[in-house]
Design a protein with these regions (language model features):
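Short acidic-hydrophobic, aromatic-tinged amphipathic segments that line or gate anion-handling sites
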Residues: 1-3, 61-69, 181-189
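Glycine-rich, highly charged phosphate/nucleotide-binding loops
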Residues: 1-15, 122-131
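Internal active-site segments that recognize and position negatively charged phosphoryl groups
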Residues: 69-103
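C-terminal functional extensions of proteins
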Residues: 139, 148-160, 168-190
């Protein structure tokens, strides 16, 4: 990285940056706050680019939560076989749930601690609707947990869950820092 907000501010000054865009992942909250602090320190205008989040539709059984810890508390009331698609970080929030079985899909191998009854599936989107239907069926999943990352690459799991009548626990995005304007697509940034 840049060495925190101070390192990013130094880099902006050193390179004579006139304006910059925070196009990080919606859950890269620390980096977004560093960018906001660096922008405030250097008086360089900052714009956040965030793809739209997902929204529930008719037939969806979504449970909106503010954190992975809150998701873990809710899970035992919703199902026993969990498709966990929150990435490899943060699995410790679920580690004590020994009575549940987890299918963890991640780009990279997860770091311990994580639940004892876990099967890891290393995979990277985009995913197809047919593939997600088959995955839910084959693993007898009865609840899905995801972060609201938005975008089309990983959205088919939500459609497959709706079709199967499964509850989905959706972790809300962290807020964009105050006073940072947000746009949903690059054209709006112009």
């Amino acid at each position: 990285g840049f060495g925190g907000a101070e390192g990013l501010a130094a880099w902006l000054r050193e390179h004579g940056v006139d304006a910059f865009i925070d196009a990080t992942h919606p859950f890269a909250g620390t980096m977004s706050f560093h960018a906001a602090r660096a922008a405030a320190t250097t008086h360089v205008p900052l714009l956040a680019l965030r793809r739209p989040g997902w929204a529930p539709g008719p037939g969806d059984d979504w449970h909106d939560v503010g954190s992975l810890t809150e998701a873990a508390r809710l899970l035992p009331t919703l199902g026993r076989r969990v498709f966990l698609t929150t990435g490899r970080m943060g699995l410790a929030a679920f580690a004590a749930l020994d009575d549940l079985w987890f299918l963890v899909r991640s780009v990279d191998p997860p770091e311990a601690p994580y639940p004892a009854r876990t099967e890891v599936l290393l995979d990277r989107g985009p995913f197809t609707l047919d593939g997600e239907r088959e995955l839910l069926r084959r693993h007898r999943v009865d609840v899905v947990v995801t972060k609201d990352s938005g975008g089309a690459a990983t959205a088919p799991k939500l459609t497959a869950a709706r079709e199967a009548g499964l509850p989905v626990v959706v972790v809300r995005r962290p807020p964009v820092p105050e006073d940072v304007p947000v746009v949903a697509d690059p054209e709006a940034a112009a």
